[in-house]
């Protein structure tokens, strides 16, 4: 039986940051589940960079069903965790069930991949202090406030934690995460 990886997300997550790791990890042979506050069809969004705007723009993206709710997750059944960005982490960081999941993965030193605004979740459970991370560049101060050393790079690896800035960095992010997975949490 293939090892299982959990993606935690919600409405307004960045479509590419959910679906790229979902597909890439399945290609590697992992079983991948998506968890959200409740089992429902999630509405993802697409962020883009357009001329004349000082920040990214947002449009409706894909919809995708959540396989299970946060309350249904048994962290012990999963070998790794993926935390996409978008706006979802802004409100998900207040979800107590999700906070329990995040703490369990970090307490067990399991591989965690986070991208864009995803590090807001790991900061909310005090799991970044003393670590090197990257995130969407506008979160540099948030990362420093969480005790992390912010690095503006495509992908940053600190032990079992792999972070990236945003979807343009997918290749470097997944390449580094797969190295960690092959070492710490192989498919079989």
Name each region found by the language model.
Residues 1-108, 112, 121-130, 140-188:
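Extended, subdomain-level signal for the structured scaffold at the beginning of enzyme domains
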Residues 133:
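Anionic-ligand binding patches
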Residues 116:
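Catalytic nucleophile serine of serine hydrolases
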């Amino acid at each position: 039986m293939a090892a299982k990886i959990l993606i935690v997300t919600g409405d307004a997550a960045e479509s590419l940051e959910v679906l790229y790791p979902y597909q890439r990890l399945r290609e590697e042979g992992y079983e991948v589940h998506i968890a959200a506050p409740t089992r429902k069809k999630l509405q993802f969004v697409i962020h883009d960079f357009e001329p004349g705007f000082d920040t990214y723009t947002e449009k409706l993206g894909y919809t995708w069903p959540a396989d299970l709710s946060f309350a249904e997750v048994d962290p012990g059944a999963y070998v790794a965790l993926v935390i996409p960005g978008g706006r979802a982490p802004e409100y998900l960081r207040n979800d107590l069930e999700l906070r329990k999941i995040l703490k369990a993965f970090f307490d067990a030193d399991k591989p965690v991949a986070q991208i864009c605004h995803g590090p807001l979740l790991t900061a909310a459970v005090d799991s970044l202090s003393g670590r090197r991370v990257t995130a969407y560049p506008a979160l540099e101060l948030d990362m420093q406030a969480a005790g992390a050393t912010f690095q503006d790079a495509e992908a940053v690896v600190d032990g079992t934690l792999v972070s990236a800035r945003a979807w343009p960095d997918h290749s470097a992010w997944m390449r580094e995460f797969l190295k960690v997975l092959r070492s710490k949490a192989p498919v079989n």
